């Protein structure tokens, strides 16, 4: 049995030689730690020609950006690996491939995606991937349908819910999405110039009631195996290709949470574009983001309904019209969770580069205010925003 220890670059090379499935493992000779996240070590492993051939990822027993004062379970590495394996089974073209996982070392070896780029960076740089939103919608439809009650036998579904219980990581989501932004908390992070805006969130009874309802749905609705953190920084893109990574927040939850998080990150980019590109040049890019959102949702909904028509196993759920009615509830959830993502990324612990890298302070603060204002509107008006076209109209209204 392996004993947990924090990997060095040398350890990563030795491990990849053993488990990366390379024809000539001795060709793997060096590694570089490239992780920029908060929870893990990530190594690129290179061959003698300097070509990256594999990724070695190890969970740390604490939140990296905070330190050992915020401990974390290492079991999240098992949950991430098993989530990605399950998602790969249903959407191999859009999920990173896991070659090997060791639960004792909390380490996995996965395919190298050096020919891809992190989508967030490409969005900020205004590099457009016209197929990405459709591919993301297809990924979400495939993995969420095939792990839902529409497809799984009830016994299998209940067993999987138990397998993917993820209380430690869900607690982080519960705090960062639904608690911290609406109270005074040391984890919150925002410029002093936004103090009045953030205080208004804390004093907004209508908003806090709506957030409570969202949190309750996050607690109680085990609809499908979520990615749990499907933002533009956990998606790799290339010409004609999209791959989801980083699923340590995977658990069975409300389908609208993944949809809303994905849409929310496109809207965060939308909010930040005037600061990144200038007001004049941002106009066309903003329209692309809104088109991305439309394509993401319509692709997801069409694929999910087609899968439901073809593959639903439960007689009651297969009744004509039920899948469509279910998706209306998913959409309402998605709009609310989208608003939560906008707010928590603006005032909470973990921000996004789409806005944080804006050099001009006044413009950055204005973009943050835009995200906060839009986020609040989406949360409190979610039940009235009954279509993707209505969502886009609301976004334009708050621009």
Swiss-Prot record:
Any single GO BP term: L-methionine salvage from methylthioadenosine
Biological or metabolic pathway of the protein: Amino-acid biosynthesis; L-methionine biosynthesis via salvage pathway; S-methyl-5-thio-alpha-D-ribose 1-phosphate from S-methyl-5'-thioadenosine (hydrolase route): step 2/2
Transmembrane portions of the chain: none
Top EC group: transferase
Catalytic activity: 5-(methylsulfanyl)-D-ribose + ATP = 5-(methylsulfanyl)-alpha-D-ribose 1-phosphate + ADP + H(+)
Enzyme Commission code: 2.7.1.100
Assigned keywords, A-Z: Amino-acid biosynthesis, ATP-binding, Kinase, Methionine biosynthesis, Nucleotide-binding, Transferase
Pfam families for this protein: APH
Gene Ontology MF terms: ATP binding; S-methyl-5-thioribose kinase activity
Residues involved in ATP binding: 40, 57, 111-113, 246-248
Gene3D superfamilies in the cross-refs: 3.90.1200.10, Phosphorylase Kinase, domain 1
Annotated residues for binding of substrate: 229, 344
Function in brief: Catalyzes the phosphorylation of methylthioribose into methylthioribose-1-phosphate.
Assembly with partners or alone: Homodimer.
PANTHER family: METHYLTHIORIBOSE KINASE
Similarity comment text for this entry: Belongs to the methylthioribose kinase family.
HAMAP family: Salvage_MtnK
Protein name: Methylthioribose kinase
Lineage: Bacteria, Pseudomonadati, Pseudomonadota, Gammaproteobacteria, Enterobacterales
């Amino acid at each position: 049995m392996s004993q947990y220890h924090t990997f060095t670059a040398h350890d990563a090379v030795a491990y990849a030689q053993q488990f990366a499935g390379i024809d000539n493992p001795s060709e793997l000779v060096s590694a570089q730690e490239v992780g920029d996240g908060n929870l893990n070590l990530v190594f690129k492993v290179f061959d003698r020609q300097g070509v990256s051939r594999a990724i070695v990822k190890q969970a740390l027993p604490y939140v990296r950006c905070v330190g050992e004062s915020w401990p974390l379970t290492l079991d999240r590495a098992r949950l991430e690996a098993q989530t990605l394996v399950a998602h790969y089974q249903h959407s191999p073209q859009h999920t990173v491939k896991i070659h090997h996982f060791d639960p004792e070392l909390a380490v996995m070896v996965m395919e190298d995606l050096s020919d891809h780029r992190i989508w967030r960076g490409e969005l900020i740089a205004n590099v457009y991937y016209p197929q990405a939103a459709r591919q993301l919608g297809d990924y979400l439809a495939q993995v969420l349908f095939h792990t839902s009650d529409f497809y799984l036998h009830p016994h299998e579904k209940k067993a999987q819910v138990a397998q993917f219980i993820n209380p430690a990581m869900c607690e982080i989501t519960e705090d960062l999405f639904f608690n911290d932004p609406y109270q005074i908390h040391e984890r919150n992070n925002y410029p002093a110039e936004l103090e009045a805006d953030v205080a208004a969130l804390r004093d907004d009874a209508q908003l806090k009631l709506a957030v409570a309802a969202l949190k309750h749905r996050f607690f109680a609705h085990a609809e499908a195996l979520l990615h749990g953190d499907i933002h533009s920084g956990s998606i790799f893109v290339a010409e004609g290709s999209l791959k989801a990574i980083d699923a340590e927040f995977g658990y069975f939850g409300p389908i609208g949470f993944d949809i809303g998080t994905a849409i929310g990150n496109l809207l965060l980019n939308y909010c930040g574009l005037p600061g990144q590109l200038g007001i004049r040049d941002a106009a066309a890019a903003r329209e692309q983001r809104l088109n991305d959102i439309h394509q993401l949702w319509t692709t997801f909904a069409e694929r999910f309904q087609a899968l439901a028509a073809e593959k639903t196993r439960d007689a009651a759920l297969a009744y004509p019209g039920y899948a469509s009615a279910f998706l209306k509830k998913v959409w309402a959830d998605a709009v609310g969770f989208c608003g939560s993502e906008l707010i928590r990324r603006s005032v909470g612990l973990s921000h996004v580069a789409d806005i944080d890298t804006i050099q001009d302070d006044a413009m950055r603060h204005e973009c943050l205010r835009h995200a906060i204002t839009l986020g609040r509107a989406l949360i409190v008006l979610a039940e009235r925003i009954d279509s993707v076209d209505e969502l886009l109209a609301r976004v334009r209204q708050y621009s």
